[in-house]
Amino acid sequence: MSRSLKKGPYVEASLLKKVEELNQKNEKRVIKTWSRRSTIFPQFVGHTFAVHDGRKHIPVYVTEDMVGHKLGEFAPTRTFKGHAGSEKSSRLR
């Protein structure tokens, strides 16, 4: 279920403040964040965020196509190592 339109998009206030300060200074710097739930605003385009995946911070460079999505969508939390190998192939060798 999506968020109510009357509420508007959510973004962590401290994250928005950091981006606004960097935009005023014309700086590009990696912004470390744990806020995976924050919506990507148009002001974020061109910035790199280090989004926490539960273990480490994944660098995410924001483009125009990402506006409206959440930061957490671009930093996967699960790593798939693959299914166990077939026992038949290991027995034949």
From Swiss-Prot:
Pfam families: Ribosomal_S19. It comes from the Bacteria. One of its GO terms (biological process) is translation. PROSITE patterns: RIBOSOMAL_S19. SUPFAM superfamilies: Ribosomal protein S19 (SSF54570). One of its GO terms (molecular function) is rRNA binding. Keywords: Ribonucleoprotein, Ribosomal protein, RNA-binding, rRNA-binding. GO terms for cellular component: cytoplasm; small ribosomal subunit. Protein S19 forms a complex with S13 that binds strongly to the 16S ribosomal RNA. Belongs to the universal ribosomal protein uS19 family. This is Small ribosomal subunit protein uS19. The gene is rpsS.
